[in-house]
Amino acid sequence: MSRAAFIAGDWGTSRLRLYLCDAGGHVLARGEGEGASAPDCAGRFAAAVAAWDKAHGALPAVLGGMVGSTIGWREVPYLKCPAKPAAIAGAALRFEVEGRAIAILPGLSCTNISGVPDVMRGEETQILGALRLMPKLAKGKHLLCLPGTHVKWAWIEDSTITKFQTALSGELFNILAHHSVLARDSGAVDPESKAYRLGLDLARDRYEDGLLHLLFSARSRVVTGEMAKDAAASYLSGLIIGIDVYAAVAASLSLFSAGVVHLVCTPMLAALYSKAITAYGLGAAVIDGDDAALAGLVHAHAEIFS
């Protein structure tokens, strides 16, 4: 059996995912814990890895995500783009706790394509992992999409994160679906449904009307009998994601090549965004978000502790 060499931790606001890894980055064991927003990160981390410590000693740990924010363990300043993988690893905050070497990765900041400040924390680790898992991203210009509550669109050139832009798509959908008249109690989103496709098509064909002028159709189509109530959530999702994709792609065609958008996310979000991307005539390549986060942490460990 391989010998344990380090601990990798993907530590978001609501959940901690831990990986006990050998020197080559292969996972030997997994663990979980509370998110970075809960109090006493140091104590909770120690408790989560206590069994590993007993078996292997106090192994070094590399952590990414909201653990480095103002609500986390220790705040790590944002690194300004353009940012290369080595620079991200080099900007990690390093310290020791009870004989354990710890490194927390920074988030990134930039002036986005709208000319305003933007930030990310956690997604940069997934981007590092995407570069490791898909070597062809190391050369040329590429567009990565990292869907979630706050969707990140990142532009990569020769392994360098040049800039990125945040879309509030996930949070907007959750607010409208659960706290408005548009799609309350309307069922789950189905990326294969006619309603989802209808939302995508309207977003594509009437983009110039603006999202605010299209959203109420999720309600009016139901009230007039044109669409079943249980289809409203899928339709609303199609509208929001469709406009999100169109805005990001249309604003940046000169910033990426090959006509492919690389998605880094869960399978469900990949299904939703892939359909939207292909609706605009582009290809979609998918990288699992958890796999990318782990690969990014493994890469960072090699850079920091080598």
For every predicted segment, state its role:
Residues A5-G43, I287:
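Short glycine-rich, Thr/Ser-proximal phosphate-binding strand/loop in the N-terminal lobe
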Residues S109-R204:
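Glycine-rich phosphate-binding loop plus the immediately following alpha-helix
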Residues F6-D10, P60-G64, H142-L146, H262:
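Short glycine-aspartate micro-motif
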Residues R204-V245:
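Adenine-nucleotide phosphate-binding core of ATP-dependent small-molecule kinases
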Residues R15, A258-A276:
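Glycine-rich phosphate-binding loops at beta-strand->alpha-helix junctions
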